Structure formats: C-alpha cells, structure tokens
Amino acid sequence: METLPIELGLLISRYTGINEITKYRTCSKNSKKYVEDVLTWFDVKCNNKVFGGLNMFANVRKLDLQECRCITNESLSALTNIETINLRSCYRITDNGLEYLSNIKEINLSGCYEITDSGLRNLNKAVFVDISNCPQITVKGIVKFGKNASIVIDNCPLIKSKHVNLLIDIELVKITRNNHPFLSYKPRHIYEKSTNNHIMTHQTKIDKPKFNIDDLKFSSDSSDSDLDAISDVSYVVGEVSDDDNSDSGSDSSSDSSDDNSDSSDDSSGKNTSKSTITKTQKATVEYANDYISKRINSKRKILFDKIYYHPINKRDDIFMKNYEDLLPNDQLNSRQESLNRLFEDKDRKNFTENLKNKSLDILIGGSMGLYCVYKNTNFKPNDIDLYIKDINLHKIKKIENAIYKSFLFDRIVVVNSPITITWYLQLKSGKITSIQLNKFNIKSWAEMFITYHTDLTCIGYEIITDRFVYMKKRWDRILTKNKHYFSCILNLDTASSIRRSCHKYAERGFNCVCINTDFKKYNQKSESDDPFYDDDDDDEPRKKKIHKKKYPKVINQLMISYYGIEEAPSSLPNRAGSLGNILDDDNFVNTLINKYKGIKNISFSSSIRHFKMEKFFPDIMMMCLYKVNKYMKYPDSSNGTEFHQFSIEKKKTYIEKTKKFFDISRSETKISHESLKIKCLECCCYIYLNHLISKYYSNIHHKFSARRDSDSSDFDDPYDSDTEYNLVCKHMLRSFSKKNHKDRCLVLSVI
C-alpha cells in the first residue's frame, strides 16, 4: 500500500477495520510510517479497553479518549502534536500529564478531578477548555485563559457564580456551554464493545439493529426465565432516539415502534411458550438490552448533572412541575378526583391533616401518587411512602406522634433500617398498612425523584402546598410512552429487587421492561446471575449462600464501617411487595422477622418503644456510579469505576456520631400507655434484647416496669440450652398469664 497514492490509501482505509490497519503497521518500517501518515486524516475515537500505547496516534489531529480510565500521564507523552483531545472522565490524568499537551487547542477535562490551577498553565494555546466537574479548579485557573478561550465550568464547587459574573462583566473570561461537535458528551454505542480498541469516526456510522420476528423463534426446550428475558428486551432498541436532547421527538417516534413491537411480541409469544433461544438470538437480545441501558443511563446522568448544577433553592422550581399543568388529559384524573382517591381512607386523611398542622414539608410518593392521578389503575396501594426535607430527630418524632393520633391499631411494628423507618400497623379492622419514611437528607424533591428506578412513580402529593407535583422529563413521559423501563442506574437496589418491582407494576396493568446488567433472569439458585452478588474471599460453602443477597463490596464496606450493619433489607419476598391482610398475630410478626432477619440490631419489646436516635443524621443519597460532591473509588475495580454510594462528610467527629446513630440504645424508656391506644399495654412490661435474629444468641436484658410483680424464681438460668428467642417468649408468656391477657403484644423494633 505504500506505493499507492495517498488518496487511494485513504479510500481503502475507510473500508478497512482498525485492527487490520494496526496489524499492517507491524509489517515493516515503511508500513508503520504509512499507517501513521494515514491516521492523520482521521478523527479517532477509543473505547474503554485502551490501556495505553498511544504512540501510533502521535500524528492524529483529533483523538477521543473519554471514559478511557486506564489512560495515565505517561500515555499522553506520545501526543505532543495533537490539536483536539477529549479526556472526559480520565481521572488518572494529573497536572504532570498536561505538560505534554502544551500545543493543544481544544480539550475536554471534565471529571479529571486531580487537575489543579497549576496544570492549566500548560494549556497556553487552548481556545476551548471544558473543566466541568473538576473540584480543585478555582477562579485563578480560568483567568489565565483570558477572553480568547471559551471555558466550560459546570459543577466546579470552588468557582463561585458571583466571581464568574464579575469576570464576565469586565470581559476577563468567556464562559460557554459544551456544544462542541467533537468534545461534547455523547454516550458510547453498543458497537464499541467489539474487540477493537480504537475506532475511527469515518468507519463507525452503523444503523440501529433491526429485529425480525423470524429471528426470535425458539425450539421446544425453553426455560421460563429465558423467555421472560426475551419478552423484556427483544424489541426495545428502537425505543430511544440517537439525539439525547430531542426528548419530544424521540418519545413520539418511539411510540410507533412500541406498538409494532408489542403486537409482534404478543403474536409470537403464543407459539413460543416452550422453546429455547439460540446463541445468535441470545446475542441479539444482549445487544438490545445493553443498547437501551446505555441510552437510558446517559439521559438519567445528564438530568442528574443538571439538577446538582443549580442552587438548592431553585431545583424544585426548575425540575418539579404542578400536576394541574397537564390537565385536561384523558389519561389523568382532575385535581378533585385525585384528592378524593388520596383521602378515600379516613385514617389516611386524618394522618395527612395532622402532618400539615405540624408544618412538616413532606411529600407522599411511591405508588400512592400514581394511583391518585392516573385513571387506568387496577390497584389500591396499602402503604404510604413519605419523604421529608432537612430531616432531623424532632421532625421524626412529630411524624410518629401524628401516626398515634391518626390510626387506631392493635399491633404496631417499628423497623428502623439504615435508610428507612417503617411503621407497620395492624388496625382494629384486621387490615395491615405501613408507613415508610425515607431517611434521605434531601433539600429538594428533584434530588429524590432522580434516584427512582422508573418514571412511573416520579409524582407525589406535597402536603404543605396541597398539590400534586411531578418530575419534569420523567413522569410526564408516561403519557406518551407505552413502555416503562426499570433500572438501577442511580440507586442501590439489587437486580432481583428491580425485577420484582417491574413484575409488580406489570401485574398492575403497565407495560414494563426490566433493564439489568446481565442477560439471565435473577435466579436464587445461582448467585452469579445477580450482578450485585460478590463472593470474593468467602470460604462459606455454596449451599449456605444460595439464598443470600449481597450488595457490591464497596457498599458492604460502607455499611459495616459507618453503620455497623452487614446487609440492608430489600423488598418483601412476595412479588406484590405488600403484607396483605394478615389477621394472625403470629404471622404478622413472623413475616416481618423473616424479612429483616439479615439485620443484627433487632429487639423485641412488649410495648411501643420510642426509638432513641442521635441528632446527626447521615447524609444518605442512593447514588451509584456517579458523584455528588466527592468521588469514592472502588479499589477492586479492574477499570477504575468510580462509586459514590453515600454522600458522607468524611470528618472523624461526624463518623463517630453517625456510628452512634445505628448503635443500640441500652437505656430504659418509659412508655405512657394512655397515649398509645393499645389494650395490651395494661401490663406495662418491658423486655429488651440486644440481638434477636442472628446465628448465635448472647445476653438477655430484662427490664420490667414497676407495675409488674416479678418473681425471681420465674427467671430461667441464663446459661440454659434454649435459644435467646425461646427464653424471651417464655418470660413474656408468663407475664401475660399473670395478668390474664389473651393477646400477645409482641413488638419488633430495629434500633
């Protein structure tokens, strides 16, 4: 090829794979020089498999290395002549690496959080610089560029808006948005998962894959799990458009493809109830699943960035909209009809009014908001999900007091997990209901709704303003889309929990698709099917781990270090995610025990115990694979993926107080039985356990009120062979028999 004219060589290179070109480069010295000359005519994009060795791109003019997290300072030493480079999320790049880029004209350093003002001094010739998400850059760093360079400074905490406005007024800097055709953020497509490490722009224009119904015919030996996965992701590729910014256009165009795909899926599903998929069909579905996941992932992160870019006091005004703005609509109830649904239960209405009287800025979210405003619902939620701004102990006690004033119940169970407090109530009618308070330290509703795994539930009732609000660019999409995606992009839910939620809403009449990282449906018989399962350095036999559900190692480390707890609870084991009507007291308590048996800090009490908490609440936000204020690196990750599971201020005093937040309180609490409306509290007995549900039981702490006449002879030997649980049951039964109580006031409380 060296003897061919350069024009003909370029034409051949456009239709040749990059692997073939690089292989030809190794043939001889002449071929090496020829390939390097040819590459100067291409804009080269690299995928995240690049580990270094950029010498062959020494003469390339434009190079895209975004999210190539293994690129180091040494890798840039061969790029001294490059003019345009994209280093977005290459977090290993430091100020030393920028010394090799002194001739650069356009550069994207977004997410390179090791860069400081000193490193920017090397970019003297730059006319476009994106330093978004660089927490160490100050105003001094951007002033050096002058007004001849365009600077992008989104989400730089050390650059205050008042300083930037002043510099703009006196024309010292030129601030802009990143609309650069080569350096702006564009999510990587599925074809970049090929074995090639480098991709040339001129060769990568590939149409969306077109799925044919005939390609997804199965043989007669199919498993239900595989068929479920196929039905989830077979025809979703056309759902999302290429343009991330054209929301309305993509929605309308995707609906038509949804209708066609749904009808095709229904027609083929009748004849494929017993079949298996081939390797080609499986690869096709993996292709589709990964493609749609990347698109949704990209849009969600962009929206997340926009939320945290704005000041706290403006986030709800920008991203939360009044539900009445969508009216009239054939799919939605009027405001009065929505309120009638919300207050159709008298106890719920009283509870809402009591919260409003206490001036608590609370939002009722979850499925309750969807049920109230959406006409075509075939379900009635039996639980209430609460979110509160600026959470503290005083506000939680107000909520608890409102529960006692609003509901008349026979049994109550208080479960305090690391991220929620749940009150399970067994009412006088026998009905079971639950009230769950999320302990996220949020300042706006937008911060909470961005973590939801589906657009369906991004609506709620704001009590203090007496209106329904929804998240813009999320919930309003359900009015134009026929398919609803469930994903764990910015939350800590396991794949199995996401799939259960997906099935729950599918049973409620919605067309739902679960987007998982793995092709296989989660199966409890195989932990490897769950992408969140981690069995590294675990000598426990496989048989004992069959039903364990673990979160990623980095989450477990945080839970153990900061909260003293090994595993957080997920959804209830049943698909509906609801307790239902459990009239039997034993079943009511045992069901909750089975749900929370993975938590050690559980205690039984014979009366309602006001949980004692520290005033300092951990700043918890369920964020995965993205950052809020700081980066938290996953040390065992092969590709350097960054995690920010919990936004916690890393101060020693704060950590100590956070630990105390989840420690068990061993002080006796006096209960005023007149205010709790529970018949069984007449005995006023009190039993406290340090640990209840665990493999081995340790000490028993017996604390009884003065009204109970205890006999020392009734106490069992603490070294009795019975388990701690059995000992407590014996003591409780004896106390009840003395007072002739028919009911067992057994109450569970996680401290």
From Swiss-Prot:
InterPro entries: Leu-rich_rpt, Leu-rich_rpt_Cys-con_subtyp, LRR_dom_sf
GO annotation, cellular component aspect: SCF ubiquitin ligase complex
The entry's keywords: Leucine-rich repeat, Repeat
LRR repeats mapped onto the chain: 79-104, 105-126, 129-148
Top-rank taxon: Viruses
Keyword Repeat among record annotations: yes
Gene Ontology biological process terms from the UniProt entry: SCF-dependent proteasomal ubiquitin-dependent protein catabolic process
Region called Disordered, residue ranges: 239-278, 527-546
Segments of skewed composition (Acidic residues): 256-265, 529-539
Domain F-box: 1-44
SMART domains: LRR_CC (SM00367)
Name the record gives this protein: Putative F-box/LRR-repeat protein R753
Organism: Acanthamoeba polyphaga mimivirus
